[in-house]
Amino acid sequence: LQCQAYERQYGQGKCSIVRPANVYGPHDTFDPDSAMVIPSLIRKAFTNDKLEVWGDGSAIRDFIHAKDVATGMIFVVENKITEPLNLGSGDEISIKRIAETIATAANIPIEWDTTKPTGDARRVFDMSRADKLGFKPQISIEEGIKNTIEWYLENQEAANTSKDVFKALNGAI
């Protein structure tokens, strides 16, 4: 509906809609109050002597690297795709696998806090339309976590600075 309204109001052509899965990568938000799971676990792993993770790690998610999202957006525009398109890996990746990958890189143990919620059991995108149209993410979860950790370690000061615009504007409003 938003695209139809935009088209009517501005007389522009078609509108493209992408729905990215859990996006991660360099330059992400590592602020513990607002970070998503991968940057949050990376920060915890490299600022503590153990990696504390909520739940039991069984939750399944779909992750996609930020570069693959950018590539997917360009793909959608260049191919004039006007139907909503999911951008994810389509891979079922457990939080346990994410935590183990990060803890191994940091050379620390994992402590599972099963008194905290695990989250929804499974949230994975249907990538059949993207597959049919020819879009396939290129960065594996292991490669993506590795380059996100490398960026984080080289840019900790910037990474640990909040990028929450609402926090920054709180006193100005």
Language model: regions and residue ranges:
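Hydrophobic alpha-helix immediately C-terminal to the catalytic Tyr-X-X-X-Lys motif of short-chain
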Residues: Q2-Y6, V37, L41, I98, ...
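Amphipathic alpha-helical recognition patches that constitute DNA-binding helices
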Residues: R19, M36, S40, S94, ...
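Short-chain dehydrogenase/reductase
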Residues: D31-P39, D62-F63, E92
